[in-house]
Curated annotation (Swiss-Prot):
Forms part of the ribosomal stalk which helps the ribosome interact with GTP-bound translation factors. Keywords: Methylation, Ribonucleoprotein, Ribosomal protein, RNA-binding, rRNA-binding. Part of the ribosomal stalk of the 50S ribosomal subunit. Interacts with L10 and the large rRNA to form the base of the stalk. L10 forms an elongated spine to which L12 dimers bind in a sequential fashion forming a multimeric L10(L12)X complex. Pfam families: Ribosomal_L11 (PF00298), Ribosomal_L11_N (PF03946). This is Large ribosomal subunit protein uL11B. One of its GO terms (biological process) is translation. One or more lysine residues are methylated.
Length: 141
């Protein structure tokens, strides 16, 4: 018998650091086992420590769940590679950092599975647009 989906929840958590206190406000109303989710998430993300890894949780009527990991947010990766804490308050007028085209390609390769394209060049353009909106310049190698 097919399980009936009750709800789908997406949350952003730091890899390997999920605990019931952090996920409680988002997942407690769904009725799933919070400790079970945290243990499963931490096990799945133990090789990605230090990154923010979004999780898409499909919750079924019987309170069981399925976890699917996504790639880290583009903004998080751009800030990490540019070495900045946050994006520009006034993008276009203010520059907070810069990345090389090789770093842009690396970020695009990481994000490619979650983007609506299969071309690395188009993925680079998508990530470059995000960088521009954050006040991060892209410099040629």
């Amino acid at each position: 018998m097919e399980k009936v989906i009750k709800q789908i929840v997406t949350i952003n958590l730091e890899a390997g650091k999920a605990n019931p206190a952090k996920v409680g406000k988002d997942l407690a109303p769904t009725g799933i086992n919070l400790l079970g989710f945290c243990n499963q998430y931490n096990e799945m993300t133990k090789l990605q420590l230090g990154l923010v890894v979004p999780a898409k949780i499909t919750i079924y009527e019987d309170r069981s769940f399925n976890v699917k990991l996504k790639t880290p947010p583009a903004a998080f990766l751009l800030k990490k590679y540019a070495g900045v804490e946050k994006g520009a308050a006034q993008p276009g007028k203010e520059v907070v950092g810069s990345i090389t085209t090789q770093q842009l390609r690396t970020i695009a390769e990481i994000k490619l599975p979650d983007l609506n394209t299969t071309s690395i060049d188009r993925a680079m353009k998508i990530i470059a647009g995000t960088a521009r909106n954050m006040g991060i310049n892209i410099e040629d190698d």
